[in-house]
């Protein structure tokens, strides 16, 4: 009996595993979401060496966006600052400003680093937000105490996986 239970557990566990490869949602509609952010993309632009990168996945079926934001050189050592939030805006094309869609409170005193974040559940995208987001009309900023409207900006681009 003990052997039978162990075999049953192994069979169930093996059946739950995937082969790896491309991630997929319930029906396979998953998008890669990427962006390269700089201070030059802000409107109006500011002159800094700050950069950031956005790398994520959006599952259209579950309406979940998971992502990692990596940033560097947000400030000089002599002018320390603090990240206060990550803000999503839309609809707007590159070179234009949009309305605030989501503000995620996030605090870091590191001028370089990364964070794994997400939008899901109650904070998932509404239908109009989803339309704008999927058409590339969203951008994000990293806001700090000194740069309350953003020190870097990056337009979010989607491509189906």
Predicted regions and their residues:
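Sec-dependent bacterial lipoprotein signal peptides
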Residues: 1-17
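Metal-centered catalytic cores of metalloenzymes
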Residues: 17-86, 90-161
